[in-house]
A protein has these predicted regions:
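Histidine-centered divalent metal-coordination motifs
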Residues: 48-50, 220, 241
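Alpha-helix-loop-beta-strand connector modules within alpha/beta enzyme cores
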Residues: 194-209, 229-237
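Distinct, well-ordered alpha-helical segments
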Residues: 156-160, 186, 225-235
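Bacterial N-terminal signal peptides that target proteins for export
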Residues: 1-7
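Substrate-binding cleft of carbohydrate-active enzyme catalytic domains
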Residues: 204-218, 224-228, 258-264
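N-terminal hydrophobic targeting/anchoring segments and the immediately downstream early-domain regions
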Residues: 22-195, 249-416
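Acidic, glycine-rich loop-and-beta core segments that form the ion-binding/anion-interacting portion
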Residues: 223, 231-266
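Bacterial N-terminal signal peptides
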Residues: 8-17
Length: 416
């Protein structure tokens, strides 16, 4: 009797599954309903956004001079945790340049702390994966302090400990331009190869970050630097805002070899909605960039693409630099949400959904049609549902993988 009941149940399940399959793809209304239900059940983490300080170039703002990551946008988008970057851009590595960069980093740290203090009922600082989950369960948004570009440290390794004590739990060695710790995938005016990846100081930094329990961010490193970091690190790493080089040949994107190395390390690649990383440049980009450079008094360059266009821009005064960057961004391709998820698709097929995440780089030029600020985050879930991703895959991509890495990094630190 029990056997007959089991057989009947199995046949019924099979019949229902066949009927659902025969019904064809979901309608837009069904996709929307399913995506909303998934969004309500998962924890969504943005692994990289920027802090907007007064005086930031207008191009970094959303229309209406607003932040793409303000509280209203974060809430409307259902974001459960966001990493705000204490980031500085390229600049002189002189004592004066380092001092100015450190002042900018300190100002961004102060902004994050003020943001948390001003909204105690809506946000809270997270220093661990458990913190993120507890803050989310309490109905608040978890704020993660991240750090980008050790130019602000000069050659001071102890600066890592200082920022750790201030709450930083995610750390990237470079931005555009090499520094004392590592070579950048976007050199600006200096030799493209200075340290052949990490400098001795950069190698020490990897050990320090492992010891402290800080997640290492390999976005912005050269391929050599990325592979060296992974070979040295005792814990998984992440790329907090990078895309796929096999789809768009940009030095900021990651090659298949780099993707495979991150997978082998147990790490995660967080996809960014940054136009020139998602769509290739136009065939006349270099010619138009040359005209733009001439307009702002910059000498000709032999380098191609964005690196050539940006070469030597540190010499421009702030107001001219902002205007130049505005013109530079206008030369960039205009990508869409579909382009963005194409890169997620590639990563999932190449390294698996357990190694893919979301990192927007909002407030620093990122944003595509359909995913232009945090309020449009549900569109990403909707597109993933449309393409057949399961709820578990979406959960992992939207934050589960970040939490796994965070826990492993903390565990490695605890073993030392």
């Amino acid at each position: 009797m029990r056997s007959s009941t089991w057989l009947l149940t199995a046949l019924l399940v099979s019949s229902v599954a066949s009927t659902a399959s025969a019904a064809g793809p979901l309608s837009e209304a069904e996709i929307d309903a399913k995506a909303r239900a998934i969004d309500a059940r998962i924890l969504k983490i943005d692994a990289h956004t920027d802090v907007l300080l007064p005086g930031e170039p207008e191009l970094n703002y959303a229309p209406g001079h607003t932040s793409r990551t303000d509280l209203d946008n974060l809430t409307r988008g259902g974001i459960g945790a966001v990493a705000f970057a204490i980031a500085v851009g390229p600049g002189p590595r002189t004592p004066e340049g380092v001092k100015a960069a450190r002042a900018e980093a300190d100002a961004k740290l102060a902004w994050i702390r003020a943001f948390i203090k001003d909204h105690p009922d809506r946000v809270a600082l997270a220093s661990s994966a458990d913190d993120i989950e507890h803050i989310h369960a309490a109905g608040k948004i978890a704020i993660i302090e991240s750090f980008l570009n050790a130019r602000s440290l000069g050659g001071d390794l102890s600066g890592i400990d200082t920022f750790y004590r201030d709450g930083v739990r995610l750390f990237g060695l470079t931005h555009a331009g090499n520094n004392e710790f590592a070579d950048s995938s976007r050199p600006t005016g200096e030799p493209a190869i200075e340290h052949h990846g990490l400098s001795p100081l950069g190698r020490q930094a990897v050990a320090t970050l492992n010891k402290l329990g800080v997640i290492i961010d390999v976005s912005q490193l050269t391929p050599e630097g990325l592979i060296q970091t992974i070979s040295l690190s005792k814990a998984p790493v992440i790329a907090s805002h990078s895309d796929v080089r096999a789809l768009v040949d940009n030095t900021r994107n990651l090659s298949d070899a780099e993707l495979d190395a991150i997978k082998g390390n147990g790490g995660v690649v967080h996809v960014t909605p940054f136009n020139p990383y998602l769509r290739p440049l136009s065939s006349d980009f270099d010619a138009k960039a040359a005209v733009l450079r001439q307009k702002y008094g910059l000498p000709p360059t032999t380098r191609h693409g964005p690196i050539g266009a940006e070469e030597g821009i540190n010499a421009l005064p702030p107001e001219k630099l902002a205007a130049f960057m505005g013109g530079f961004r206008e030369l960039m391709p205009k990508a869409t949400l579909s382009d963005y998820v194409d890169h997620i698709d590639y990563l999932v097929k190449r390294i698996g959904a357990d190694h893919v995440g979301i990192g927007t780089d909002f407030n620093h030029g990122a944003g595509v049609v359909g995913f232009n600020d945090e309020s449009e985050a549900p569109n990403v879930t909707r597109e993933l549902v449309r393409r057949g991703y399961s709820e578990e895959q979406i959960r992992q991509i939207w934050g589960g993988n970040f939490l796994r890495v965070f826990r492993k990094v903390s565990a490695v630190a605890g073993q030392r």
